[in-house]
């Protein structure tokens, strides 16, 4: 583990995904706090967590999603997901679970993200709120 700046890593990953956003006609609403948020984490794990969550959001997005990083170290990823429901969201971290209309989904991305978050002493939760899938990560 090393002292990682969550802001910088998140910004790098979002920049790498820019062409995918453009291709998929996704306009992300990104809100990253100005204060640098540092945590003692495995950097490669953090990158993988962000990639897995973003890939999942792209698969299920209806053209939008939100990413927020708060000073507290809480990250919130949200996107419209009208094809989901509360029961489905409860299974979202189960290995091999997929939603029927997922584009090339294998069902391991969020399961791996959960394992990596927990290995880095964080928490990850998913809720279905007003037609949106909201994934919250805390470090």
Locations of regions flagged by a protein language model:
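Conserved catalytic submotifs in the C-terminal HATPase_c
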Residues: 27-37, 72
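Short helix-loop "hinge" at the ATP-lid/N-box region of the Bergerat-fold HATPase_c
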Residues: 57-58
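Short beta-strand/loop element within the Bergerat-fold HATPase_c
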Residues: 64-74
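Conserved micro-motifs of the catalytic ATP-binding
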Residues: 1-2, 38-42
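Short conserved segment of the HATPase_c
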Residues: 84-96
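Short alpha-helical Gxxx[C/S/T] motif in the catalytic ATP-binding
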Residues: 109, 113
